[in-house]
Amino acid sequence: MKPTLKPSRVTIRAPTRSDCGAFLRAVRRSRALHDSWVSPPSTPKAFTRYLERFSSDTNLSFLIIHRSAGDIVGVINVGNLVRGALQSAYLGYYSFLPHAGRGLMRDGMLLVLRHAFRKLKLHRLEANIQPGNLRSIALVRKCGFVREGFSRRYLKICGRWADHERWAILAEDFGK
């Protein structure tokens, strides 16, 4: 299925220190949604570390912002960016309540993909997803990612090693 980018209900931007309060409130509101899938920063100190980690050339973060409400809808991180012959990065992402399940993360993901492929000139983006995370799998599938494989005990999530499916999208597949 060809992913299409329509006039978006969201914008993307880098997080700043001034986002800390709204971000932490969104994390608290969404604890049940994130349980066992992801551990977003949940304290001011953790938020500061997050900003420091994702302010380099190899790790970028984008807040997905609802255009009309101004709320933080979710986060998409572009991490471990490798240049040279690979031109690749890994994606990590999560949404916040009450916006989950409304297609806003899809809109945000398409904007991040466009930025990664057109502005950053990346060739490949990869998302590793726990097999039971059906919403996440549906998101990447709707954005044009292809399932490439399975990695046993791949990432330590919430204190335990978890299996993951490997999904990827190439620059030449985006926007065809």
Where are these regions (language model features)?
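A generic secondary-structure signal
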Residues: 50-53, 115
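A short helix-loop-beta-strand connector motif used in the catalytic cores of GNAT acetyltransferases and
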Residues: 52-63
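Acyl-donor (CoA/ACP) binding surface of acyl/acetyltransferases
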Residues: 1-22, 26-29, 61, 65-176
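Conserved GNAT-fold acetyl-CoA-binding loop/helix
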Residues: 32-51
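Short helix-loop boundary/capping segments at the starts of domains
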Residues: 29-32, 56
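Residues at alpha-helix boundaries and short interhelical turns
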Residues: 38-41, 58, 99
